[in-house]
Amino acid sequence: MRKVAIYGKGGIGKSTTTQNTVAGLAEMGKKVMVIGCDPKADSTRLLLGGLQQKTVLDTLREEGEEVELEDIIKEGYRNTRCTESGGPEPGVGCAGRGIITSVNLLEQLGAFDDEWNLDYVFYDVLGDVVCGGFAMPIRDGKAEEIYIVCSGEMMAMYAANNICKGILKYADAGGVRLGGLICNSRKVDNEREMIEELARRIGTQMIHFVPRDNFVQRAEINRKTVIDYDPTHGQADEYRALAQKINDNKMFVIPKPLEIEELESLLIEFGIAN
């Protein structure tokens, strides 16, 4: 079972990219589980046909300790197993702590046991690595390979670099490695070349360049992944390609984060700062 975590700047399209990629893996016949690690609880909606899933923490709050696996895991597109950790009530408590509680409960209830024949577990993690709770999949060895969703925008690259610092910090203890950058295009000038160069300097690869296409939003409005909504569309092939590249990936590295000056010089070199 491969344990994958998807990180990236808030709003970069992690949940969309994760769900569309998982749909590609499921179409290949892979058995996948998706764990949403975001209080917004939107990491599995497209796989479940738009259903807002009841989160692990909400279920715990309402039902106490008497929780069964079927209470917190729902079957989605092509038998993907979907769960959302959820978070505390707004303004109260720590969302990162909620992720730790949820993942530990899933383990206790046997969500990762051999009987499920899982090929992949995907953790879709909120925003940058800003606190220990959100770093938990990296820190505690829950995830073994990380993919960072980014774009050619400065803050997305800055966040990607920060996440690499988090991976570096826990690489020895947790055994986690970076599998590559996924460029979720924002149509920035020289975007593909810039992210390829960023990946090279960090010591990794740009595993796939996902072109920007409004069809992704159209599929979302219809509460589906692109592959589910229109399997013949060109954008569906992009996500299939990304799924195949992740499935075939053999390049797992401890990243070499850049100094802020190096990052800024990269932006200047490729024209974004002009």
Swiss-Prot record:
Catalysis: reaction(s): N2 + 8 reduced [2Fe-2S]-[ferredoxin] + 16 ATP + 16 H2O = H2 + 8 oxidized [2Fe-2S]-[ferredoxin] + 2 NH4(+) + 16 ADP + 16 phosphate + 6 H(+)
Example GO molecular function: ATP binding
One GO-annotated biological process of the protein: nitrogen fixation
Segments passing through the bilayer: none
Record EC number: 1.18.6.1
Post-translational modification: The reversible ADP-ribosylation of Arg-97 inactivates the nitrogenase reductase and regulates nitrogenase activity.
Listed CDD domains: NifH
InterPro entries: NifH/chlL_CS (IPR030655), NifH/frxC (IPR000392), Nitrogenase_Fe_NifH (IPR005977), P-loop_NTPase (IPR027417)
EC class of the enzyme, as a word: oxidoreductase
Cofactor note: Binds 1 [4Fe-4S] cluster per dimer.
Binding-site list for [4Fe-4S] cluster: C94, C131
Residues bearing PTM ADP-ribosylarginine: R97
Keywords attached to this entry: 4Fe-4S, ADP-ribosylation, ATP-binding, Iron, Iron-sulfur, Metal-binding, Nitrogen fixation, Nucleotide-binding, Oxidoreductase
Cofactor(s) this protein requires: [4Fe-4S] cluster
Organism superkingdom: Bacteria
Residues where ATP binds: G8, K9, G10, G11, I12, G13, K14, S15
Function according to Swiss-Prot or TrEMBL: The key enzymatic reactions in nitrogen fixation are catalyzed by the nitrogenase complex, which has 2 components: the iron protein and the molybdenum-iron protein.
Subunit structure comment from the entry: Homodimer.
Family under the similarity heading: Belongs to the NifH/BchL/ChlL family.
HAMAP family reported for this sequence: NifH (MF_00533)
Protein name, UniProt field: Nitrogenase iron protein
Species this protein is from: Chlorobium chlorochromatii (strain CaD3)
